[in-house]
Amino acid sequence: MQHFVGRNNELNDLNAKYQSPNFEMIVIYGRRRVGKTALISEFIQNKPAIYYQGIESTGDMNLKNLSEKINDLKNDDFNTASYADFEKAFTEVQNIANHLEQKLVFVIDEYPFLARSEHSVSSILQYVIDHVYKKY
């Protein structure tokens, strides 16, 4: 079994935020190929998580793929429909979190790809964070 090497300080910081009783939003950024995704993957092990990687495609395709990731966590094999819009998808993430014993980690990797595919997604996410997520 390979152990996670390096980034222990960052991993400890993420785990401390996870233990916080408050909503936490963390942005991880940096040059390409420096281990950001590996850090995130290590952090979400053994935690309820939705991991979504944005793609260079259309907003509709990103919404469809995000919807699949949300439905995967819900173990909803029968619901293959996409959410009507990103606001509904992001709000459903909180609905799922409300029914879990542990905090839910919601990861959007390669966010710039998602933001380029759907120009309103950043303001939608900000709205949902301010009006839905921060209530909890």
Region spans (language model):
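Phosphate-binding site recognition
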Residues: M1-Y136
